[in-house]
Every structure is written in C-alpha cells, then in structure tokens.
Amino acid sequence: MKRYLSVLAAVIFLMSVVSAQTDKDIISTREMERINWMEFKDVVPSKTSTVLLPTGTLEPHGVINNGADNTAPFAMAKTIAQRTNAMIAPTLPYGMTGSLEAYPGAFQITEAAYRPFVKQILEGLVKNGFRSIIILNGHGGGQSAVLNSVASEVAIEKHVRTLVINWWTFASEETKEVFGEDGGHAGNNETAFIQAIDKTLVHPEKYKGPEMTTALPAPAGSWSAVPFPSSIELYQKNQGYPTFDQAKADLYYKKVTDKVAGLINETVKKWDLAGL
C-alpha cells in the first residue's frame, strides 16, 4: 500500500509539473505596450502572427463605468490571448459614441476622423508582421459598420486576414442561457460582464429600477431620440434589467470568452487550411 501511495504521489507530482510547463507562456507578456522591442522582434511573426485589437468608446452605461466598452474587450483579450496565441494591441478607447454623447464624461469622434485613424492602426499592425488581425469591438452603432468596412479594406489591400467581433451580439444565445431573457446596453449582460472583471466598477446602490431604462425602438426605426432618454437600453421591453448576481456574472464571462476564443481559433485554422 505504501509503495502504491508513493507511486501515486510521484505520478500526481509529475502531472502537476507537466501542467505547469504547459501553462507557462512562450512570451513574457502578450501586451504590445509592455513588451520590449527586442523580444517583440523574436516573437512576431515567428511565434505568432495574430493580434487582438480591443476597440470601444467612452459613454454612460447605467450603473457601471463609462469606459465599459473598453474594459470589456481588453479584459477579454487578456483572458484569451494565450489560448489563441495572439498578441494584444493597445486599446483604442475613443469611438463613435452617437446618441449618448450628451451625457457627462462621454466623448464623440466623428467618422471622418475615426475611419482613417483605425485604418492606419491596422496598417501599422500589418507592417509589424501580423497576418491575422482580430478586432474585439466593445461598442456598437455606426462604429461597428465602420470597423467592418475598414477591416475589409485592409484585408484586401494588404493581403491579410481580419475578423471583427461584436461580443454582445455574438453571445446573444449565452445571454439568454444564463439570464433566461434578452440583454441590453448596460443591461443584465453587459453589467454582469463588467462585474466579473471588476466588481468595484459596478454600483448597484445607484440603480433605481426600471425607470432608469428604455427599450430600443420596436419596430426598429419607428422612433428616434437624441440624446437617448436612458443609458440602459433594453433590447426588448421588460427584459434585460441588471441583476448584480455574481455567480451568473462569472458564468457569463466564462461562456462568452470561451465562445469568442473558439471562433478565433476556428477562423484562423480555416484561413490556414485554405492557404489564405
């Protein structure tokens, strides 16, 4: 029995060592703004040619931080960078805010300024050796369309591969799975995502109930208001109110990041398989 236990202990120890070696990253840091230029030269593109670019904006988000659209994609990038073997470009924190720009602390960048700036960032990533550029977008509205357009232009002009992911839309089924209903801008899904990242950015005491929310126009295009009357915008009426449930927040974060990582790995694998 003692011999058996000794062998078992040795096996468990060996497995832990192998696991630790497997988990150890091949790069000292995945963040481009933290890595030294000499290590970057040794890593890109020989060890990785994939980069994650978080994009967002500054605008009100109910009872969470104004920079939620930046916080979410950057945290996601850090969570999935190693398993997608990707570097992380610095977050682009200013964007095309739209109908919430009148709220305190919000910033609005025009399309005329935003489009060429994003294009030069993508071109800079190509120049630095990246062939697969993944935009993790945290803000919707007109910004999503511009990112899609610019990413497509760069892919065609520079003969690289681009993928734009609007995480809240991509994870709509996970929202319904975890919360049992649809979500919203600064609603149950986005509030939970931020709560899982940093609960100090969430202020339940400031939530006064449904009067702080407004459902998006239904049917779409039936009405328009600027500024939008609430910073919590429900995708469907009477669904998506913030719940502040930590267990659901943690589960949701894991499901979303797992799904996004899976999409990236599958897409890059198929690009490679096709020789693109």
Identify the function of each model-found stretch.
Residues 1-4:
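Positively charged n-region of N-terminal signal peptides that target proteins for export
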Residues 7-16:
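Bacterial N-terminal signal peptides
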Residues 21-86, 90-98, 104-112, 116-134, ...:
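Extended, histidine- and acidic-residue-enriched regions that form the cofactor-binding/catalytic faces
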